[in-house]
Amino acid sequence: MRLLVSGGGTGGHIYPALALIERLKQVEPDTEVLYVGTTRGLENKIVPDAGIELETMHMQGFKRSLSLENFKTIYLFLNSVHHAKKIISEFKPDVVLGTGGYVSGAVLYAAAKKHIPTVIHEQNSVVGVTNKFLSRYVDQIAIAFEAARSQFPADKVTMAGNPRAQQVAAKKDSDFSWTRYDLKDDVPTLMIFGGSQGAPKINKTVVDAIPEFNKRPYQVIFATGQKRYDDVKKQLAEGNIKPADNVKVVPYIKDMPAKMPRVAALVSRAGATTIAEVTALGVPTILIPSPYVTANHQVKNAQALVKNNAGLMITEDKLDARALLTQADKIMEDEEVRKEMAHAAEKMGRPDAADRLIKILHKAIDEHEK
């Protein structure tokens, strides 16, 4: 298969694509892939690091208010469609996959106009602007949340899940040991992670909660985000707060999927990739949705878990040390609650998500050949 993939800007658009590509190369080793992203997005580092060929285009998003910048955006979009058509003509893909972000809008639109098989993948429960626009032009639509189904043309939609789920499910039997962090393997572990950049409100809340976490019968590993580690260390020093042996504060946690099968529960944002990971692995989760995302989609993502008793939610406006400790204790101090939530999360998981998406890609190709 010759696959052209486009998605950019944030990790939520990129990592599912990389997980899909990894699986596709396992089952179809002769697969050739070209990734098309933006000149300024995270894909500029992540995609080449994964050994995948990358082409970039200059894009920018629409302002939500009337603005002269929007005329520039329209010009850039039309220019990018022209650029995308050239890339498509040169690469000659069998199918084009879009995973979100403005760049995928130009690429998938161009592919559809050239009558190339097209598929979009929507990771969130609330459909993004780009995928909403593309839904009328593409052949197939893969979703990760049932809530997204009604927002698309019904005859094009198939439930796939998030390919990242299959990638992390493969690490379920990880032999990782908490002794690497001077923690114990026979004590329930709560992992707290506000994202790769860290989240100031979450970090401050955890700092305030550490004196109580120090007294708990479970252990805590708290990743501050690389850029915010010094700030957290400063807050701890100013508050004269010293983490006990059962609490570890680290800048980041490398290879998170290898660690997650060994956690009793996770505190995190409610991004689509996180939801895919915790449901694939059956990890009880306390979700703190980011209030800084489009259409409040992280709240909707979190609600899907809460509704199925697979997670708890604290909105950021209600977040403080007491709220965090109350929810953490509810899970960490009751093994039966943990087991029930883990089972509920696993029931929601789609550990074959990449394989499902590969079938959808082939379906798009086959329908064009009829």
From Swiss-Prot:
UniProt-recorded Gene Ontology molecular function terms: undecaprenyldiphospho-muramoylpentapeptide beta-N-acetylglucosaminyltransferase activity
GO biological process: carbohydrate metabolic process; cell division; cell wall organization; lipid glycosylation; peptidoglycan biosynthetic process; regulation of cell shape
Pathway(s) served: Cell wall biogenesis; peptidoglycan biosynthesis
Top EC class, one word: transferase
EC number from the UniProt entry: 2.4.1.227
Example of a GO cellular component annotation carried by this entry: plasma membrane
Localization terms from the record: Cell membrane
Pfam families reported in the protein's UniProt record: Glyco_tran_28_C, Glyco_transf_28
Binding site for UDP-N-acetyl-alpha-D-glucosamine: T10, G11, G12, N124, S196, I253, Q298
Record InterPro entries: GlcNAc_MurG, Glyco_trans_28_C, GlycoTrans_28_N
Keyword list, A-Z: Cell cycle, Cell division, Cell membrane, Cell shape, Cell wall biogenesis/degradation, Glycosyltransferase, Membrane, Peptidoglycan synthesis, Transferase
Catalytic activity: Mur2Ac(oyl-L-Ala-gamma-D-Glu-L-Lys-D-Ala-D-Ala)-di-trans,octa-cis-undecaprenyl diphosphate + UDP-N-acetyl-alpha-D-glucosamine = beta-D-GlcNAc-(1->4)-Mur2Ac(oyl-L-Ala-gamma-D-Glu-L-Lys-D-Ala-D-Ala)-di-trans,octa-cis-undecaprenyl diphosphate + UDP + H(+)
Membrane protein topology class: Peripheral membrane protein
Functional summary from the UniProt entry: Cell wall formation. Catalyzes the transfer of a GlcNAc subunit on undecaprenyl-pyrophosphoryl-MurNAc-pentapeptide (lipid intermediate I) to form undecaprenyl-pyrophosphoryl-MurNAc-(pentapeptide)GlcNAc (lipid intermediate II).
HAMAP family: MurG
NCBIfam families found in the cross-reference section: murG
Family: Belongs to the glycosyltransferase 28 family. MurG subfamily.
Protein name from the UniProt record: UDP-N-acetylglucosamine--N-acetylmuramyl-(pentapeptide) pyrophosphoryl-undecaprenol N-acetylglucosamine transferase
Organism encoding this protein: Limosilactobacillus reuteri (strain DSM 20016)
Taxonomy of the source species: Bacteria, Bacillati, Bacillota, Bacilli, Lactobacillales
GN (gene name): murG
